[in-house]
Amino acid sequence: KGVATLKGQVSYALAENSQRATINVMLDGTILSKNVAKKSGVTVNTNGTTTIHAEKRISFDKNGFTTSPATAKAATKLELGSIDGPSSTHESIAKTKFVKGRSVNEEAASQLSVDSITKEMDANVLELLGDVIDGYKTKIRDPLLRRGGFPEQFSTSSTKGFVNLQLLQTGRYQLAASSEPPALNKSTDVSLILHESLVRNFTEVVLGGVELTDEKLVEHLTRFGAEIPDELKIGPGKKSWAITFSNTQPISVGFRNNQIVIAIQGQQFRDGMRLIKEPIRIAATYNVEKTETGMRLQRDGDVAVDFLARKTLTVIQVATKTVMSKKFNALFKDDIVGQGGIKLPGQWENAGNLILQQLVANNGWLMLSYNLDKPSK
């Protein structure tokens, strides 16, 4: 019989893998044990010290997350504490047996530690990743596959310094990048390089023909912790409204000359009981710049609301345009200022904020790169 306590440290390290992004979870620790053996009236107390190193590999590719069984190496050293027997002869025999069997018992103790730690590590990692594994499958991969919107190319890889994710979203009649992306400063910690065609191509599959109601919009904004402007609030005294996204270009973005254009295109609008079956484009243009505290987006004028098939508007169409202009001017704020970088979520919160280092919005490309600003101790 005995009691064992483990003191250790968990660390993470990226692994070289050209086929999928891979990270090693590592545990380095020391197990201190106190053991008591009783036989033929003799009580032997021993102390054990086991150093252990365990690893478990986690990988991610387009199919989701996979893990390999945990592995471990351990080394145990046993020391004789005390022997209590009915006579000195009994105690001497017990000591001799301990010395002769020490190496075998140390090996057995090491194997016991390996079995225990690897089993526990497998269970803990599975519990930790359970929601992530299920969430990727049920909320991202499966819905996109059902709608035919899963990226044509979805590749991941990792080196000892970087994790890379490359996506290509395209169809037979969809657009693609016509120019090379801007040069990236590879010394930064996190980077995003996005071509405007990805947003258009992706939303055509995911949002084409989908209706967005006022209630759903408020639900989405609330989920992301955004403030609900008065023009978008729902409830008594508020007229309901909805937009049905177009099958082509439901949401598009443009990156030109340090400007970002965000556009929504609908094929049908509802304002209360009134239904407008006309294609309308709603667009906001932002001037974007890097500041000392992050990124600033300043809207260039009001949100534009245009009936695409009309040069002159009827009274009802003018009223609809006015309603949509008020609502989307409230949605697309006129000045968005980043302060102090991007705060990491959950258990990564204490790691520090991501501070913007590079910002390019030009020639169809958006590039953002960040460094992790570690908090002062």
Regions found by a protein language model. Give the residues of each.
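Extended, low-charge, aliphatic-rich alpha-helical segments
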Residues: 1, 92-300, 307-377
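Post-signal peptide N-terminal segment of secreted/secretory-pathway proteins
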Residues: 1-66, 98
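Generic preference for hydrophobic/aromatic residues in regular secondary structure cores
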Residues: 12, 51-53, 58-59, 72-76, ...
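A short, surface-exposed interaction/processing loop segment used at functional sites
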Residues: 56-58, 298-302
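Short, charged/polar low-complexity linear motifs in solvent-exposed/disordered segments
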Residues: 40-42, 84-86, 314-316
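Short charge-dense sequence patches
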Residues: 54-74, 79, 230-234
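Short acidic, glycine/tyrosine-flanked loop/strand segments centered on an H-E-D-like triad
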Residues: 66-98
